[in-house]
């Protein structure tokens, strides 16, 4: 809170990553800000080679979560919902702990009776690229987000995404992803089951995702908007 007040009082300009945060500064402090979101460019799609060797993962045979293992990401909803989905697909939880391993251990305890659920730990480089490139669905079931870069990245790889209906996710995907009610395990499970049974619908979202997100949140445009602000 002290940092916010200092920024409001002293900063020449304030850049925010989401329209929700922009509204917050306006309502709480009466301060105008500049909304400049995260950006992405189209990546190189990689075949499932390293992830196959390390985890036995093949293209379109797994649902992916990739991010920090913290409560606000909604991973417990995803695990609970997935455990009741009738599918041979795996659930891959990729990412490391934030401060301690306590929450990660809770997640592993939740998942221990379902051998379809795989924890990869922190990933980067080729592993990360392959996980994004070959997922059947990418899910971000968060209760709270700023500007979810992982969602932009997932769509840039051409993923069908399943996200919670919080503004920070819904405003990014618009009608180009599957949306479920925040914190609602039943709705999440239902949407997962439907997606696992309807490959044609999933493919439709995949076909639209990359072009849409790379145009809407192009990183070159983001850089130019930031430079324009500094030139003033």
Which residues are covered by each model-predicted region?
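Membrane-proximal helix-turn-helix segments that form the acceptor-binding/catalytic region
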Residues: 1-13
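Carbohydrate-associated surface elements
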Residues: 20, 39
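A conserved mid-protein helix/loop that constitutes part of the nucleotide-sugar donor-binding site
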Residues: 61, 65, 70-84, 105
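Nucleotide-activated donor-binding/catalytic signature segment of Leloir-type glycosyltransferases, i.e.
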Residues: 104-123
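Short alpha-helical donor nucleotide-sugar binding micro-motif in glycosyltransferases
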Residues: 122-123, 130-135
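Aromatic "clamp/platform" in nucleotide-sugar-dependent glycosyltransferases that forms part
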Residues: 143
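Short hydrophobic beta-strand element within catalytic cores of glycosyltransferases
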Residues: 160-163
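Conserved acidic donor-binding segment of nucleotide-sugar-dependent glycosyltransferases
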Residues: 178-186, 194-200
């Amino acid at each position: 809170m002290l940092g916010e007040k200092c920024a409001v009082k002293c900063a020449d300009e304030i850049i925010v990553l989401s329209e929700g945060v922009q509204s917050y500064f306006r309502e709480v402090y009466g301060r105008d800000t500049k909304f400049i979101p995260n950006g992405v460019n189209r990546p190189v799609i990689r075949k499932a080679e390293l992830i196959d060797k390390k985890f036995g993962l093949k293209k379109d045979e797994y649902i992916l979560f990739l991010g920090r293992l913290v409560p606000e990401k909604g991973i417990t909803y995803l695990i609970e919902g997935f455990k009741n989905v009738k599918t041979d697909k795996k659930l891959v939880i990729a990412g490391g702990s934030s401060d301690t391993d306590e929450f990660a251990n809770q997640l592993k305890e939740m998942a221990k009776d379902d051998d379809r659920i795989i924890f990869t730990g922190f990933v980067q480089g080729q592993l990360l690229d392959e996980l994004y490139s070959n997922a059947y669905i990418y899910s971000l079931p968060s209760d709270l987000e700023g500007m979810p870069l992982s969602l932009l990245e997932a769509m840039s790889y051409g993923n069908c995404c399943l996200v919670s209906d919080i503004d920070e996710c819904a405003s990014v995907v618009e009608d180009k992803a599957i949306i479920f009610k925040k914190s609602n395990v039943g709705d999440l499970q239902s949407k997962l089951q439907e997606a696992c049974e309807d490959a044609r619908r999933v493919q439709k979202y995949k076909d639209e995702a990359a072009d849409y997100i790379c145009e809407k949140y192009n990183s070159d445009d983001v850089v130019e908007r930031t430079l324009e602000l500094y030139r003033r």
